[in-house]
């Protein structure tokens, strides 16, 4: 046996010393470098037909944010389907998911690869991968020795998943494989602000409280709302979305509460309002601060008594709806200014959540970049998509005034630009593919808060402000349409716009 008892005991001790799951996982991975003398390793969690990295060593930081769908990565699929150690020959025709993801060596190909599927009660829960640059790097380790390492990793991961379910008071992981769970987008981030937010989401999801989600544009408030809904007892009922900022005053009441036939000119049939659609489920009211005071009063009544009146109907209708509201405005100040009802504010903000801007969680930029790189790779049908070290450094230094949404758009746009000069299907993103200008010395506004200058991409500066604004809107709409394969409804949803308003804007900009 090549692996000594002392070496295995060292791993066991390291796993016990970790203060958190993340710390334990990283200690395990770090120990593998000494134990197996590997150049790269990763501990992966299996969920919904994909592998999610939990800890890595020797790989680019953005790997932690990537999500490896089995159907896109045949080596990982082979590991998932195997019941034992998998050794890939150096000349294997199956592409390695980590090719191009070795820091500062983007063109380096992995030569030796071993995969260990991890099981708990005969259910696949994850995988351990070890890689090396020498084709014979792991030949002197027997399958039995590697199984021992895999068993220790499986025990650590299984215990962590069990504790996670107990802390969140979730049922067994059968639910995680449901179609509804597959559609839930993940809240990516390991920074302290995001860990705190995730804990708060877990806490409030199990209740039936109304939640006010606050944060700047582009931070992911809708993502938080979805996480709350899918972690609640209402998860099997509808989550209905309404952007209050896109509601014309003339139809806002009908959108919220519905109307009966003949209620007003043009009401040629009955219409079900968003509250009825969300009965027994959740209603997400985005940009709640844009509602008129008149509608705020009617919304308050529904929240207080659970009954509503359709426009043109004298009878009341009982509904059971949980309301999640979001805003990028300071509603406390709006209350003081008389623009928002104090009683509605207190009714909505029973459990307020604040979503941190990206500049306050810069640790997550690399993870998010990897997440969006993998998504862009899949959407554009690329074999490989990676960031150079210089591009990664640029992304981490940029201030991201548009937050996560701006980062997503920047990655996708850079991928489209870089792909234009490639024929192999393997794309490497460098700084030249990003229109990002790092801020120079900040100036200070009269409030004393720093205001960065020279942060506007150079291609926005030519022409007048209207022309630059139109050009920016045109680019964003076109990129979003490409991502959604020309689906205007999906495009409008991502851009948080009313579908009709989007069509009108697209016509004015010459897109339609």
Curated annotation (Swiss-Prot):
Statement: the UniProt record of this protein carries the keyword ATP-binding: yes
Stored InterPro entries: AAA+_ATPase, GAF, GAF-like_dom_sf, Homeodomain-like_sf, NorR, P-loop_NTPase, Sigma_54_int, Sigma_54_int_dom_ATP-bd_1
GO molecular function annotation: ATP binding; ATP hydrolysis activity; DNA binding; DNA-binding transcription factor activity
Domain of life from the UniProt record: Bacteria
Signal peptide start-end: none
Keywords: ATP-binding, DNA-binding, Nucleotide-binding, Phosphoprotein, Transcription, Transcription regulation
DNA-binding region: 488-507
Record carries keyword Nucleus: no
Residues annotated with 4-aspartylphosphate modification: 57
Sigma-54 factor interaction domain boundaries: 187-416
Any GO BP: phosphorelay signal transduction system
Pathways involved: Nitrogen metabolism; nitric oxide reduction
NCBIfam families in UniProt: PRK05022.1
Function as written in the Swiss-Prot or TrEMBL entry: Required for the expression of anaerobic nitric oxide (NO) reductase, acts as a transcriptional activator for at least the norVW operon. Activation also requires sigma-54.
Listed name of the protein: Anaerobic nitric oxide reductase transcription regulator NorR
Organism: Pectobacterium atrosepticum (strain SCRI 1043 / ATCC BAA-672) (Erwinia carotovora subsp. atroseptica)
Gene: norR
């Amino acid at each position: 046996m090549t692996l000594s008892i002392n070496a295995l005991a060292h791993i066991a001790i390291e796993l016990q010393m970790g203060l958190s799951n993340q710390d334990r996982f990283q200690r395990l991975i770090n120990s593998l470098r000494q134990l197996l003398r590997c150049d790269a390793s990763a501990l992966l969690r299996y969920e919904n037909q994909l592998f999610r990295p939990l800890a890595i060593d020797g790989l680019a930081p953005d790997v932690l944010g990537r999500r490896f769908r089995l159907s896109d990565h045949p080596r990982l699929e082979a590991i998932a389907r195997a019941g034992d150690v998998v050794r890939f020959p150096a000349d294997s025709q199956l592409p390695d998911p980590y090719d191009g993801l070795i820091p500062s060596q983007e063109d380096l190909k992995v030569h030796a690869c071993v995969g260990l599927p991890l099981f708990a009660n005969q259910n696949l829960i994850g995988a351990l991968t070890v890689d090396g640059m020498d084709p014979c790097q792991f030949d002197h380790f027997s399958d039995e020795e590697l199984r021992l390492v895999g068993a220790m990793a499986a025990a650590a991961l299984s215990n962590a998943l069990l504790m996670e379910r107990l802390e969140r008071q979730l049922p067994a992981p059968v639910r995680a494989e449901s179609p509804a769970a597959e559609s839930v987008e993940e809240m990516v981030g390991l920074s302290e602000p995001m860990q705190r937010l995730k804990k708060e989401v877990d806490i409030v999801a199990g209740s039936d409280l109304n939640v006010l989600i606050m944060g700047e544009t582009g931070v992911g408030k809708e993502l938080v709302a979805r996480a709350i809904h899918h972690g609640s007892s209402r998860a099997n009922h509808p989550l209905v979305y309404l952007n209050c900022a896109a509601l014309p005053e003339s139809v806002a009441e009908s959108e919220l509460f519905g109307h009966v036939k003949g209620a007003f000119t043009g009401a040629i049939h009955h219409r079900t309002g968003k509250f009825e659609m969300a009965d027994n489920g959740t209603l997400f009211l985005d940009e709640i601060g844009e509602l008129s005071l008149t509608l705020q009063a009617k919304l308050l009544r529904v929240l207080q008594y659970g009954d509503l009146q359709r426009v043109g109907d004298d009878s009341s209708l009982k509904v059971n709806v949980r309301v999640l509201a979001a805003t990028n405005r300071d509603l406390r100040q709006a209350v003081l200014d008389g623009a928002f009802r104090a009683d509605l504010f207190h009714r909505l903000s029973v459990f307020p959540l604040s979503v941190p801007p990206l500049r306050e969680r810069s640790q997550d930029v690399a993870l998010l970049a990897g997440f969006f790189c993998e998504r862009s790779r899949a959407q554009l049908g690329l074999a490989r998509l990676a960031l150079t070290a210089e591009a990664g450094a640029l992304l981490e230094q940029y201030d991201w005034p548009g937050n996560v949404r701006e980062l997503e758009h920047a990655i996708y746009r850079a991928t489209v630009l870089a792909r234009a000069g490639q024929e192999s299907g393997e794309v490497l993103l460098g700084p030249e593919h990003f229109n990002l200008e790092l801020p120079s010395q900040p100036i200070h506004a009269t409030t004393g808060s720093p205001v960065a200058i020279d942060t506007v991409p150079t291609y926005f500066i030519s022409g007048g402000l209207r022309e630059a604004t139109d050009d920016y809107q045109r680019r964003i709409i076109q990129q979003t349409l490409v991502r959604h394969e020309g689906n205007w409804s999906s495009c409008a949803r991502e851009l948080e716009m009313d579908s009709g308003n989007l069509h009108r804007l697209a016509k004015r900009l010459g897109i339609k």
